[in-house]
């Protein structure tokens, strides 16, 4: 963040909603990723799959957002809540009745960044610093969801995004993207 803290995320995506825009064949939230190009045949196959996908009762997106900032328990809970905004940027619809979406948050407090405190050294971070951490949490979780989709490989069952692509490439970022 602008305050010198790091925020990173990790996501495992098996959602009912789609992370892919059926009109373009690209992720809803492309962020810093470069999606593999899809041939017209690949795009048609992807659209057919998205239309036919019935969903199941066993879907979820699960993830972790972590920071080196010294957050308290309530602030960590808020960071986990706000990370769901990133999920909603990357997957549509998000939080369906068939999803068990859950994001956890941890704060190590190991950053050397400090703020001048006039009275008590245990005082919480300034609200502006916390808000910047929350913004970063949503951003990196959206990036992480996109990265999970673009880097996944098939092991049988539903195909992975790469199965529809000509090649895979990315520029910057990744499932562990950090701010």
Regions found by a protein language model. Give the residues of each.
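A structural signal for small-residue-enriched, beta-sheet-centric alpha/beta enzyme cores
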Residues: 1-179
